[in-house]
Amino acid sequence: MFAVVETGGKQYKVKEQDVIKVELLKAGIGEKVLLKSLATFNNDGSGSFSASSGSVSAEVVAHCRSDKIIVFKKRRRKNYRRKNGHRQNMTVLRVVEVR
């Protein structure tokens, strides 16, 4: 059985025992979090698309930061160059149960 969950404005396809990286959640390591399920499916492909029909229970494994992305802006012939980096704070979750 798998589900499509939404957190941080993004959607993830998960099944039990999956480990996913999501945007930072305010939960401590080892805590359980409940993610709302947009759709749940059985292994044969049948399922429901109701948001109220299911939920996904996950455990916080760790907090980390994503890889750095470089933002470089330049205007040719004007000696205008700006270089910035960004690292997003992430939470690593292990899916415990899909309901």
From Swiss-Prot:
Pfam families associated with the record: Ribosomal_L21p
Domain of life: Bacteria
S-adenosyl-L-methionine listed as a keyword: no
Chain segments annotated as transmembrane: none
InterPro entries tied to this protein: bL21-like (IPR028909), bL21-like_sf (IPR036164), Ribosomal_bL21 (IPR001787), Ribosomal_bL21_CS (IPR018258)
Any one of the GO CC terms: ribonucleoprotein complex
GO molecular function, a single term: rRNA binding
UniProt keyword terms in alphabetical order: Ribonucleoprotein, Ribosomal protein, RNA-binding, rRNA-binding
Keyword Transferase included in the entry's annotation: no
Gene Ontology BP annotations: translation
HAMAP family xref list: Ribosomal_bL21
Function comment: This protein binds to 23S rRNA in the presence of protein L20.
Subunit-level organization: Part of the 50S ribosomal subunit. Contacts protein L20.
Similarity section: Belongs to the bacterial ribosomal protein bL21 family.
Protein name (Swiss-Prot/TrEMBL): Large ribosomal subunit protein bL21
Species in which this protein is naturally found: Anaplasma phagocytophilum (strain HZ)
Lineage: Bacteria, Pseudomonadati, Pseudomonadota, Alphaproteobacteria, Rickettsiales
Gene that encodes it: rplU
